[in-house]
């Protein structure tokens, strides 16, 4: 079935036509791997829920940003990349770096324990944020 071309795709085509590369918007999440291992041993569903909470919160907090709006207009083309941080310290250091570099994100804290579990960035063109995330591998 043929569908109309969405605004995000049109923006990408305009950029490509003007000599710029098309912007592929990606929402990156960085999830603590140690939560799946002893002494925590959280079930997979609980860890996945943390990533879902963080992603939803980041989208909501930055809902008025043009990248977020474009990302949400193309529901069937959403791209998310889930990376792993080995521990809480690494996750907090990343949050500090993102804050210093003015990269929009949400550090999700599990309540009532106040445990930092996941960072979700708002949707970004991957080339704008890859330098901050390149040391993290895909979550397994």
From Swiss-Prot:
Family: Belongs to the PTH2 family. PTRHD1 subfamily.
Database matches in PANTHER family: PEPTIDYL-TRNA HYDROLASE PTRHD1-RELATED
Protein name, entry field: Putative peptidyl-tRNA hydrolase PTRHD1
Catalyzed reaction equations: an N-acyl-L-alpha-aminoacyl-tRNA + H2O = an N-acyl-L-amino acid + a tRNA + H(+)
Keyword Hydrolase: yes
Matches recorded under Gene3D superfamilies: Bit1 (3.40.1490.10)
Keyword Hydrolase carried by entry: yes
Gene behind the chain: PTRHD1
């Amino acid at each position: 079935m043929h569908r109309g071309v969405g605004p995000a795709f049109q923006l990408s085509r305009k950029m490509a036509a003007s000599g710029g590369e098309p912007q592929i918007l990606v929402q990156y999440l960085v999830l603590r791997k140690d939560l799946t291992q002893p002494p925590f041993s959280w079930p997979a569903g609980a860890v996945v829920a943390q990533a879902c909470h963080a992603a939803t919160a980041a989208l909501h907090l930055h809902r008025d940003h043009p990248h977020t709006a474009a990302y949400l207009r193309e529901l069937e083309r959403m791209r998310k990349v889930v990376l792993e941080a080995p521990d809480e310290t690494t996750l907090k250091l990343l949050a500090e770096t993102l804050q210093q570099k003015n990269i929009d994100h949400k550090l999700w804290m599990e309540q009532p324990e106040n445990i930092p579990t996941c960072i979700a960035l708002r949707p970004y063109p991957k080339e704008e944020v890859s330098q901050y995330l390149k040391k993290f591998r895909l979550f397994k």
